Amino acid sequence: MNTYFLFVLLGFFIVLVIYLTIDPNIEKFGIEYSVSYPNIEEIKNKLTVNKNSYFEFFKLLDAQARNIKFSFKDFQEKYNSSILEIDQKEKNNFDRFYKDVVNMIPLKKRHQILIPNLKIAKFSGIENDYPHTHSDIIFFSKSVFENDLSNYQSLENNKNLLSLAKTLIHEINHIKLRQNPTMYDTLFNQWGFKSISPQYLNQTLPNNIISRIRINPDELPDYRFWVWRNKSIPLAIYSSTDITSISDTIIISVDWNNPKKYTYLDDDDDFIDYFKIHVNHYHPNEILAEYHSIYFMELTKQLTDTDIIKTEAYKLLKKTL
């Protein structure tokens, strides 16, 4: 009887240990992370055919910054002509690059910052050639394919390509958030952000700020504005009404209690001390994407600035992953 009881007890403990040690995300370990390259017509359909799209959000300065006439037809023609074919060699190079990015990330962590099927497009002559996203597609400029990855060998000890990998993770996060726009609202609230409607902003902020807010495809179509700690509204706005590029931008902090008053966001010591970043910090979506790219660098032991990972904001992010 005692022997039987001991065997039962031993069996119970074995089952308990197995239960406690199996990762709840074990089913995600077998995910294969692939890359696909939509054809040009598919990209055009997602980017320019639907009038309830990117261009619906354009203001006069958004068109001016892109050197486009303010009409849907001109927007459509400009963006359609920017999309380029990706040849087989370029696809092979990007495939190898992405495979190396995936393999750098510990197996159990990959699902936290990657998506199963990455869609990539190539473009030239729009958005200042900055990487960006539309729908479920990440857009990279032709220089990425024709220069950065033209003779791809390895990520190892290549700072430029590691920077590209970090950018890729940033853009992937925009895709993930677009698929589930409210998935990080609890985190944003913990960071001190509270969502405010565009209608409220239009009624409250002076026109010389509202008319200069810069559109960003990565935050669309579910763009929301946010106030931080009931004291400031971070915004990216055009530096003047006489701009010639989307880079003619300043990042400001609008006083929540006095909307006619603003300072540069980098001069908001409380904000900067809390997040510890000076780029991509004008919107919680951008902070989130930047933190994911920093998390990638931490996971792959490439991180040099350790101050960020010590912040409360970054630690709160990691708890959500």
Question: Locations of the language-model features?
Answer:
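Auxiliary, metal-adjacent structural segments of Zn-dependent hydrolase domains
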Residues: S71-S143
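Second-shell loop/turn segments in exported
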Residues: S81-E90, V144-N158, F275-N280
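Metalloprotease/metallohydrolase-associated module, dominated by Zn2+-dependent proteases
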Residues: N189-L321
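Non-catalytic terminal regions of proteins
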Residues: I115-K122, F145, L161-K166, N173, ...
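Active-site scaffold of zinc-dependent metalloenzymes
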Residues: F123-I169, N173, R178
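Soluble non-cytosolic domains of exported or imported proteins
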Residues: E85-R96, N158-S163, T167, V279-I287
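Intrinsically disordered, compositionally biased terminal peptides
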Residues: M1-T48, N52-F55
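Sec-exported extracytoplasmic/periplasmic mature domains
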Residues: P106, N173, L177-P181, I294-E298
